Amino acid sequence: MCCTKSLLLAALMSVLLLHLCGESEAASNFDCCLGYTDRILHPKFIVGFTRQLANEGCDINAIIFHTKKKLSVCANPKQTWVKYIVRLLSKKVKNM
């Protein structure tokens, strides 16, 4: 009888723990860039971008480029090549 109660209590605690972990994970589905790439990306590999702003929950401003291979690459928005690609992609969207 004692073992059954302990087993039931352990099972209930496990279910509760899994439920709580699932909720906290869903609430934080946004990843922040912590640094920038050292490489210059070619525009032909980039399909889109997202702006990350430091005042919206992340530590640094960044441009997150989305590649054809479904990778996310963090880039410094102050660099010339980053500004060029953002301008290029923005023009493509306007012309659609």
Swiss-Prot record:
Cellular component per GO, a single term: extracellular region
GO terms assigned for molecular function: CCR6 chemokine receptor binding; chemokine activity
InterPro entries: Chemokine_b/g/d, Chemokine_CC_CS, Chemokine_CC_DCCL, Chemokine_IL8-like_dom, Interleukin_8-like_sf
First and last residue of the signal peptide: 1-26
A Pfam family of this chain: IL8
Protein induction: By bacterial lipopolysaccharides (LPS), TNF and IFNG/IFN-gamma. Induced by phorbol myristate acetate (PMA) in U-937 cell line and bowes melanoma. Repressed by IL10/interleukin-10.
Description of post-translational modifications: C-terminal processed forms which lack 1, 3 or 6 amino acids are produced by proteolytic cleavage after secretion from peripheral blood monocytes.
UniProt keyword Transferase, yes or no: no
Matches recorded under Gene3D superfamilies: 2.40.50.40
Compartments reported by the entry: Secreted
Similarity comment: Belongs to the intercrine beta (chemokine CC) family.
PANTHER family: C-C MOTIF CHEMOKINE 20 (PTHR12015:SF108), SMALL INDUCIBLE CYTOKINE A (PTHR12015)
Record function comment: Acts as a ligand for C-C chemokine receptor CCR6. Signals through binding and activation of CCR6 and induces a strong chemotactic response and mobilization of intracellular calcium ions. The ligand-receptor pair CCL20-CCR6 is responsible for the chemotaxis of dendritic cells (DC), effector/memory T-cells and B-cells and plays an important role at skin and mucosal surfaces under homeostatic and inflammatory conditions, as well as in pathology, including cancer and various autoimmune diseases.
Protein name: C-C motif chemokine 20
